Amino acid sequence: MIYDEFFRTAMTGEVGSASFAPYPYQIELATGETWPELLQVPTGVGKTAAVVLGWLYRRKCAADETRQATPRRLVYCLPMRTLVEQTRDACLSWRTNLGLSDEQLGVHVLMGGEDAGRWDEHPERGAIAVKQSRHVAKAGGRWDEHPERDAILIGTQDMLLSRALNRGYGMSRYRWPVHFGLLNNDCQWVLDETQLMGVGVTTSAQLQGLRDKLGRCGVTHTLWMSATLGNDQLATVDHPQPDTGWKCQSLTKLDRASESVQRLLNAQKPIGKASTILTPDNVKKDAAQYAVELCDEIAAAHRPGTLTLVVVNRVDRARQLMQQLGKAKLDAARFLIHSRFRPAERAAIQAAALDESSIDANGPGRIVVATQAIEAGVDVSATTMFLELAPWSSCVQRLGRCNRRGTCGLNGNPAARVLW
């Protein structure tokens, strides 16, 4: 099977589908001789699909020489829980569409508060954790019980890097050496959203340098993905920058010539100052009045049939604002997302709030109030956005949730707008 057909099948579940053609850079990643150290492409052009499906194609469909040179485990390291859940759901969907079983491709989550077992599809609840015991090990089991199987390990940087350092968080210290060995051998490490990882980037670079220096079993390689990662962050004592520089892959001329890529690169996000201003006086004393005024401005700016996203810095302000929106009796559906929900409730609310396909273009639309839990990597595209000022890196991440598809202002769609 050629990669074009493989990619389309993974995306649609239909062999021979004519939609969802891969970008040229995605084809190069899947069919090239070796992988780069850096993947620098803008938001919205399919980095996750490029890496996961590229690795999977090399493991399952490529020539024998390429299969043997491709690590058995894909370790997908992320800085936030929300991104882990999103990536897990995408991987499960692609696995199902390709007709692969759990034995053929395990998908496992390493994240605080999650079961160590496998994940599977539930017809009504989507992705759910399947609790493991000795009696169900054959059905999937813990990922470390079957090191001979192909597997995708998705987790937060604290859980994954601590295991690679032989100090695994949230696990028995007697099993530290097992995960230490498995995560430093025969693995393709991928670190995404590196601008949010801090010293985790440097730690991962030093670990890769030690693997190269001390040797390992099988191929172990690390790929860092970010449009803003500096080369100096990857240079450590045991991982110096080569004389020729790090091998980097970015969009090609063919990619940039694509109409969909052009739409994303040229997406408009006009920014203006909101009438409602958060000041030292109304942070506490007049917090209720601030919520009332902001609610009125949101109601006036919201466009029917679209998504309005409001990102604030504190949970208490998000709650107050949500209460005011409820009192305003707007026709638009309203959702609140923050980190203090219980896991099961948060998963259900977030899935419903971020499902853009359920927004009726002829209906009243949707308003989502969120904290920084929605900042990075979350695949949602808002037409109207309100945001409170935050550190520059956070503002950049928040702006990435506005007009993410590049469709606002085109084909009769309302234009995008950002108010701060």
Task: Please provide the spans of the model-predicted regions.
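N-terminal helicase ATP-binding lobe
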Residues: M1-W420
